[in-house]
Design a protein with these regions (language model features):
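Residue-level signal for inorganic ion chemistry
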Residues: 13, 102, 154, 204
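Glycine- and acidic
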Residues: 1-5, 84-91, 139, 177-178
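NTP-dependent nucleotidyl-transfer catalytic core
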Residues: 1-7, 24-32
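Beta-strand segments within the central parallel beta-sheet cores of soluble alpha/beta enzyme folds
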Residues: 32-36, 211-213
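Conserved, charged catalytic cores of large soluble enzymes
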Residues: 106-138, 158, 162-177
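Short active-site loop/helix that positions an aromatic residue
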Residues: 14-24
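Catalytic adenosine-cofactor/nucleotide-binding cores of aminoacyl-tRNA synthetases and other
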Residues: 38-125, 217-239, 243
Length: 244
């Protein structure tokens, strides 16, 4: 069992609370792992009620996407050191990771102009190997509570997908070699399907939409390979809008 708290609560949660629970003699299962996060500062200042410089999550989700905020706080959160939250940095991360990299990869694959269905074709063996390795690497990081590194591995897979797409040039094969076009789109779609598994803890609202569009079952922590034709006559809606 994991117990998560801020670093200012370490003495209470590691000594006083366990002592109180033991004194009750109710055979409670005490935490196996203590997780203490660092502080989130805002614009280089500690959050202070007297200064009124705090921003609540409820206020943030009124203006910004909840999955985007969840992703930012896990991928760039105060894991081992205090972080300085600024709106500029948050917006840059949102637009870079979620719009330019992830969103663009999905859009150019699933919303390819003229694409009516994704057919089971030949999966790129090297990409398949990379996906399998990512599950192992990410799992180890999560078990060690190194969430930032886990997220970095996911972004790396997205970048691998984008690079593969660019190198394969499906916009040319669509006109000249439909078999190779199908292989490329099929491989990229399988990357997206597995990303929906890996990103489930971070952006569950968006991964659910991906699985629904691709007619996939619930997320599971193992490599999946699409084995049936998927009609994509209706465009996949944009997952993340660019913040200006």
């Amino acid at each position: 069992m994991y117990m998560c708290h801020g670093k200012d609560n370490i003495p209470f949660h590691t000594m006083i609370l366990p002592g109180l629970l033991l004194a009750l003699d109710e055979n409670y299962h005490l935490p196996d792992v203590m997780v203490a996060s660092q502080y989130v500062n805002i614009d280089s200042e500690k959050i202070s009620k007297s200064k009124g410089n705090g921003i609540t999550i409820l206020d943030m989700i009124k203006e910004y996407d909840v999955d985007s905020l969840r992703y930012y706080m896990i991928a760039y959160g105060p894991e081992n050191a205090d972080i300085n939250f600024t709106m500029e940095n948050y917006i840059n991360v949102h637009n870079s990771d979620l719009v330019n990299k992830f969103g663009n990869f999905i859009n150019r694959t699933l919303n390819f102009k003229g694409l009516e269905s994704i057919v089971p074709a030949k999966m790129n063996e090297e990409i398949s190997k990379v996906i399998s390795e990512k599950y192992i690497i990410i799992s180890k990081y999560i078990e060690k509570l190194e969430f930032r590194k886990a997220c970095a591995e996911i972004i790396d897979l997205i970048e691998i997908g984008n690079k593969y797409y660019d190198e394969r040039k499906p916009w040319i094969d669509y006109k000249e070699n439909i078999e190779e076009f199908n292989n490329t789109i099929y491989t990229c779609t399988n990357i997206i399907a597995n990303l929906s598994n890996m990103l489930e803890p971070l952006i569950p609202g968006k991964t659910e939409r991906i699985r629904k569009y691709l007619k996939l079952d619930k997320a599971k922590w193992e490599i999946i390979t699409i084995d049936k034709e998927i009609e994509v006559s209706n465009s996949m809606e944009i997952l993340f809008e660019r913040i200006k």
